[in-house]
Amino acid sequence: MTQQRTLKNTIRATGVGLHSGDKVYMTLRPAPVDHGVVFRRVDLEPVVEVPADAELVTETTLCTGLTCNGAKIQTVEHLMSALAGLGVDNVIVELSSAELPIMDGSSGPFVFLLQSAGIVEQSKPKRFIRITQTVEVRDGDKVARFEPYEGYKLGFTIEFNHPMIPAKQSRQEIEFSTSAYVKEISRARTFGFMRDLEYMRERNLGLGGSMDNAIVLDEFRVLNEDGLRYTNEFVRHKILDAIGDLYLAGGAILGAYEGFKSGHALNNKLVRALLADQAAWEWVSFPEGTEQPPVTYASPVYA
């Protein structure tokens, strides 16, 4: 039996937007069953709600952004990843600005926030999206693919011509569970290259970026004094992003995901292609008295 989950208590955090550089106040609130993840722009009059829905994705350049009724919500992927990692189905995310706080560039601070708020089970079974047929999307040599699988498995390969990202550290696989997510993925930070800084600044991107919330590389090395948290932190962060992007499908995935040089755009294209092909997936749940789901979530955290 696996039930839907929400937060036990309301919790707040403050930070800056990675791309906007704006200070943002964020409040996470419990939500009822079947509510899903919904963002709320409380700085707008009237308040605008933006559901966490792959069909509402309008921005995929260096982040995943949603637009609904003229209101934007940007850089949702790290919080969505933490929610997926801890199995939280229903939550209201109130924001005082258009962009979520970047925190330390990983999903670790969001995991801590969610655990601090407490996670409780609700009265209805959790709904999973089970992959029943292979779905693949491409963009040049980039590939993202779903395949049927008993569980949730993610594999990712990156290719960067950089001495700090050798081929042997460019591949990672994870058999998804809450404990594997928290230990192996959640602390991996976003990263960027000094050579891309001018491109980003011209587009008003990365204005809140610093070595406090990203790994920064020049042509030869990592510039952060403390170095890396994992030897292959870069590809682990790509899995962190993918878990968040895929959670915009509207339910927890049961299947195998494979990404080769994929990013936010291709991940979103994959989710849209999946949802458009009704023969490729089905809703499943595991109510009391039935089989256990092939994915392990941590026991609820009662704060």
Swiss-Prot record:
Zn(2+) binds at residues 78, 237, 241. Pathway: Glycolipid biosynthesis; lipid IV(A) biosynthesis; lipid IV(A) from (3R)-3-hydroxytetradecanoyl-[acyl-carrier-protein] and UDP-N-acetyl-alpha-D-glucosamine: step 2/6. The active site is at residue 264. It catalyses: a UDP-3-O-[(3R)-3-hydroxyacyl]-N-acetyl-alpha-D-glucosamine + H2O = a UDP-3-O-[(3R)-3-hydroxyacyl]-alpha-D-glucosamine + acetate. Its cofactor is Zn(2+). GO terms for biological process: lipid A biosynthetic process. Keywords: Hydrolase, Lipid A biosynthesis, Lipid biosynthesis, Lipid metabolism, Metal-binding, Zinc. InterPro entries: Ribosomal_Su5_D2-typ_SF, UDP-acyl_GlcNac_deAcase, UDP-acyl_GlcNac_deAcase_C, UDP-acyl_N-AcGlcN_deAcase_N. It comes from the Bacteria. GO terms for cellular component: membrane. It is an enzyme of class 3 (hydrolase). Its EC number is 3.5.1.108. One of its GO terms (molecular function) is UDP-3-O-acyl-N-acetylglucosamine deacetylase activity. PANTHER family: UDP-3-O-ACYL-N-ACETYLGLUCOSAMINE DEACETYLASE 1, MITOCHONDRIAL-RELATED. Catalyzes the hydrolysis of UDP-3-O-myristoyl-N-acetylglucosamine to form UDP-3-O-myristoylglucosamine and acetate, the committed step in lipid A biosynthesis. Belongs to the LpxC family. This is UDP-3-O-acyl-N-acetylglucosamine deacetylase. The gene is lpxC.
